[in-house]
């Protein structure tokens, strides 16, 4: 019953927002994971969005008793836009481990898609008894009148949680695919994305619930 309730709440949460969870995967060998010190990385050229996103997640993790560090606090802003070799990333991982980090949360945009949504639904229209003239007149406005459709953009994103533990290896713990539909403000989108992400991570027992049930402001 508890699981069904959680699913119902999640569906309600998703349907009320412009951020949707499309799919996710959890390492079957890991039932529960607890970050003690986590690096938060948002890969985007939009520095404002990256800063808000990383700061919001940092605050949420800290509210749960986890030490969290933004990539913008540790590296130059150009860190995510410059190519890294496998050797360089290995060195970075070793530095993180030696400084007490045991996990990395990495979010990036993996695709962009332009969409068209028609405002009028023609599925129930009687297709049996109509003439060419009626058919043409009914559908012509779809193509010639912009008021009949909405154009919007979907950003396909991926968030991955990695363990960089000294004893457990450097393994992928969880991966989620989230779609952002036509974002109208950075702050609103960040709030929706982070809230949904945290909800899923809590359900998967990969992050502790809030110590205090209070809204965290940017």
Task: Describe every region a protein language model picked out.
Residues 2-7:
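Sec-dependent signal peptide recognition
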Residues 8, 108-111, 180:
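Residues that line or immediately flank small-molecule/substrate-binding pockets and catalytic motifs
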Residues 12-15:
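C-terminal motif of bacterial Sec signal peptides marking the signal peptidase cleavage site
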Residues 17-34, 134-218:
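C-terminal/domain-edge helix-coil "capping" segments
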Residues 27-53:
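N-terminal export/targeting and maturation segments
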Residues 45-115:
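N-terminal segment of the mature soluble domain
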Residues 87-160:
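Surface-exposed short loop/turn segments
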């Amino acid at each position: 019953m508890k699981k069904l309730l959680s699913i119902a709440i999640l569906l309600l949460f998703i349907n009320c927002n412009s951020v949707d969870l499309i799919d996710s995967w959890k390492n079957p060998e890991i039932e529960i994971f607890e970050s003690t010190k986590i690096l938060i990385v948002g890969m985007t050229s939009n520095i404002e969005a990256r800063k808000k996103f990383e700061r919001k997640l940092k605050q949420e993790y800290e509210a749960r008793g986890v030490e969290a560090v933004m990539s913008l606090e540790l590296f130059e802003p150009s860190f995510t836009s410059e190519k890294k070799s496998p050797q360089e990333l290995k060195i970075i991982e070793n530095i993180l481990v030696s400084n007490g980090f045991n996990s990395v949360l990495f979010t990036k945009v993996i695709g962009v898609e332009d969409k068209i949504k028609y405002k009028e639904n023609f599925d129930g229209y009687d297709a049996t008894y109509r003439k060419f003239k009626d058919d043409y007149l009914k559908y012509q406005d779809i193509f010639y009148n912009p008021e009949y459709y909405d154009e919007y953009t979907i950003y396909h994103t991926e968030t991955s949680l990695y363990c960089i533990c000294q004893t457990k290896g450097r393994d992928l713990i969880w991966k989620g695919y989230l779609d952002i539909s036509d974002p109208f403000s950075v702050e609103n989108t960040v709030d929706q994305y982070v809230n949904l992400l945290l909800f899923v991570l809590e359900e998967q027992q990969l992050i502790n619930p809030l110590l205090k049930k209070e809204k965290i402001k940017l």
